[in-house]
From Swiss-Prot:
PANTHER family: CYSTEINE--TRNA LIGASE, CYTOPLASMIC (PTHR10890:SF3), CYSTEINYL-TRNA SYNTHETASE (PTHR10890)
Binding site for Zn(2+): 29, 213, 238, 242
Stated name of the protein: Cysteine--tRNA ligase
Record note on quaternary structure: Monomer.
Amino acid sequence: MSLKFTNTLSKKKEDFISINPNQVKIYCCGVTVYDLCHLGHARSYLNWDVLRRFLIWKGFEVKFVQNFTDIDDKIINRANKEGCSTDELSERNIDEFHKDMDTLSILRPTSMPRATKCLHQIINFIEELEQKKVAYSSNGDVYFSVDKHKNYGKLSGREIEDQIDNAAGRLKTNQKESKKNSLDFALWKKSNSGEVSYSSPWGNGRPGWHIECSAMVKQELGESIDIHLGGSDLIFPHHENEIAQSEACNGKELAKYWLHNGMVNVGGEKMSKSLGNFTTIRSLLEEDISPMTLRFFVLQTNYRKPLDFTEEALKAASKGWERLNNCLSFGYIYKIKDQSKNEIFLDKPIKKSANTKLDKNSFKLLSDFEKYMDDDLNTSGALSILFELSQPIRKIINFLKEKDINEVDQDELNQVFNKWELLSELAGVLGLKVNLNQEKPKNNPELDTNKIEELIKNRSLAKANKDFLLADKIRADLKNIGIDLIDKPKGVTEWKQLSD
């Protein structure tokens, strides 16, 4: 089966064929950095992280670009409210964004351009649109002429005529005077007195939201890309407007494939900051929800479908991840001596291995996993394969609760280790990173205080190097396996096992 995606542009599931063989260029719309990220952001970026990991596993070279909108009305309003500059607010929230994404083991993009760092490219892009007579300036603003783009509405399926009256009713008085058409959208906005602004041929102002992405795509990836990503709430107007301005400027198709993730719902409504029904990633993790539980929860639902967020669903995901993690931990306990040298413990993509030692059943499961993922990233189906691979490992784990590993038939044990290696590889494709298991077999000689002491030493070094993110992560990892740390004077750290 070939790799297929549901393309919002064609409204069909299509075979994926990259523009250049073995190379994929991807652009993902990033966050507006005025606040902490919520679960809706986590859902989106976890899904696209898995897409990227899967493409790399299949042998593609992936260039993945994701932007930051660091100047916007929301940022200006929040900065005024907090009494800080827009730069200070943006910088702080960009740092917090990285902390959240790193904690969730989301691979950092190849490039993360910021709107304020791309002003030259944005202004040049707008000037090109003016030269092509598809943009016009008015009272310090610059607008895109929607009626000059014949295919406007091709992504969202909206007809221009159906939108004109609705748009006209939403216009402010000054916009009615400036716009030629109620659907025309801003490429450059004149700044109000006292607002942050940047110089331009049209006077002081700031870029419109849509033009940022078009300029950054062109700067980072060229005029045409393979895949454009975002939430379904961005289809109109943001992505529709991106297509219009990019294709009018470049005369080429902006993206072959448009993939959109569904929304996270709470009580039947979309989770959003405007509705006040959002849960931040930070607050979830502070409630002892592990990063891998959150990833597992998200991957149980296809990326295109709505994801219902309930406490019950999160608890079920926690139990499911615990079962899978117990099996992933098995190889570390009995085979892998150095965690730092094994790919399954690291936040990096995994490439497909030769898998020469697999039995017939394991080859079939490997094939089924790839078929599920090839079918529009069917992550729930892929997870079912991981649990099927886990069954013989679980059997051995249960045996070892009462017996010694030397009592297991060596051929059988070798086959189980082979299955574990495949399980670890496929879990890595989904970005599921093993946590050392709380549920150790009773006779396991490597429930090993040496490993705990080594992690504590690594944490102390991280603190000495002021790498507090790593130090906090080591503490969290130890807590996940039932170990609590107590920091004492003079840099001494003691530990104790948490009671059930």
